[in-house]
Structures are given as structure tokens and as C-alpha cells.
């Protein structure tokens, strides 16, 4: 049986950032990162990787600020970040209230759209605000970059499903799909949307977290250099120029709940139709170029704030990031470290 001080279950962006911070905080600890697929191949793989300074509450805005600052030093280190101009479309009657959901660093000012393909009718009752502080990332590539540096200090175990968590004196025995057992003093559960796994389903049921489908469509038109990220705040949607892939991406809010990660399936006609209907209000030319996209799911908390909590003295849950795993991962990891520092192990 292998014995670790800390075992992290889930190798998405949240689990990977937690691993980075654990190694920094506890350089002498034995640490493992366990992932049922390849690290980054779950929700992180499908993520648009969009980061902008927004939060539904003061807590989430602070988490957004922390994470934004965390990512900045990696810009000059070859991280797959792509910085973008940013604009916000919202109702004229409540634009000041809308801006309160964003950090002051966004610096929003009333403007015209920077995207010539965006059309707002004169009587539509909407305004455009220009801001700053946005980027998108290739989240899967970022995870691989960080894993390369982590492998010398973290035991990365990919392709292994956790089949059971057995409490033991001083920690947990983690049963794996290859019939091995790994012991750990502290277990950090960062499962993304895999909430229904028998190993932890009952342990987290009381958190009230549910899994919702996420849809983003691709638009077969190459963005011009300098094209902005456009946030449609009232619709909870955004349009991002994916320069690294040579197409636009439009993400909108799906309301299909209680899905399972293994059963989201491919895009359906209704997914594409819903995207076209919404985008046609603002950019009919782009709406007409929607042909394909991506679909997966993520975990959503009742409060729409990430959940970082101790389930017992040896088990921490970190998740329910509400589709913002990349945007908030560093702050989530910081909260995990805070919980760990309160425990001797």
C-alpha cells in the first residue's frame, strides 16, 4: 500500500492548481494527484478558458481578483494565454447595477461596440461598455504545462478511478480501479461534475450541488486581429474570438440539469438552434455561421459560489465552481490551503 500525506482526487484545472499550491506550502510532503482519465480531459478540456473580472457576490469578486493576479506572472513564462479587449452589453436602464458585478479594475466606460458584426437596434434599450482585464486560455495545454513541472514532486496517477474511500486511523484508504489501495492523511476531493461516484456520492449529498449541461458553439468565421470578447450580461452569454483556433466561440446558458458526465452526448439540433436564436439578436451574420461546437457539463452550487469545505478531519471538498473552474481555480486552491493549515498531519 502506498502512503501519502496528501492525495488530490481530480486532475482538472482545480485539482492541478491545488497540487501546485500544496507542493509550495508543504515541500516535504508526499503528494499524489489521481485522475480517472488524463489530467485536464474532463470539464477543463471543453472549457472556453475565458477569464474576466466578474463575480455574482463580493466573495466571488474577491476570488476573481485573486485568480486574475495569480495568472499574471505566467504571461511571460509561455503560458497559453490570449489577452483580449473586452466589452459588455447590458440594459440601458440598469447598466450601473450591472457594472457592480464586476471589479473596478474592469474600468467600464460607455462606448460603441468594437465588433462591427455586433448590431444593437436604436430602440433596443441596451448599451455597450468598454472595459479591460479579459483573456482566454487553452486550459488543457496549461494543465499539461504545469504537470510537466509537478511530476518531479507529485505522484501523478492517470486513468485510475477511485472506487471507494475507506476511513482509517489518521486518514483514508483510497481504493483504485486497478485493485490497489493508496493511503492518505488528507484527501482533497476535486471531482468536477463527477458528483455521483459511489465513492463519495453520499458524503457530498448534503452540499446541494447539481450538475448542469454546458454548451458552446463554434462559428465558422475567422476573427479579425483585435476583436473583442463581448459579454452579453443579461443573457449570461459571451462571444469570444478564439484566435488560436481560427474561429469564434459563443457560449450561452443551458438549462438542462442533473446530467451525468458520461451521458452528455454530442451536440443536438436544439443546442445549435438555441444558440442561433440568441446570437441572431446581436450578430445575425455570425449566427448564420454556427455549425458545430462542444458540449459537456459542470457542477453548480445552490449559492452560485464555489464550495470549499471540510467533510471531516481528513477529507476536503473543493468544487461547485459553476462553470468558472478556470477563472476561480487559484482562489479555490488558496481556500484549500487555508483549511489544510488548520490541521496537523
What is each model feature region?
Residues 285-345:
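C-terminal catalytic lobe of FAD-dependent flavoproteins
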Residues 129-177, 190:
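Helical element adjacent to the flavin cofactor pocket in flavoenzyme catalytic cores
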Residues 180-228, 268, 285:
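Central helical "cap/lid" subdomain
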Residues 48-128, 236:
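Dinucleotide-binding Rossmann-like beta1-alpha1 core, especially the glycine-rich loop
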Residues 225-311:
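Active-site lid/adjacent beta-loop-alpha segment flanking the redox-cofactor pocket in flavoenzymes
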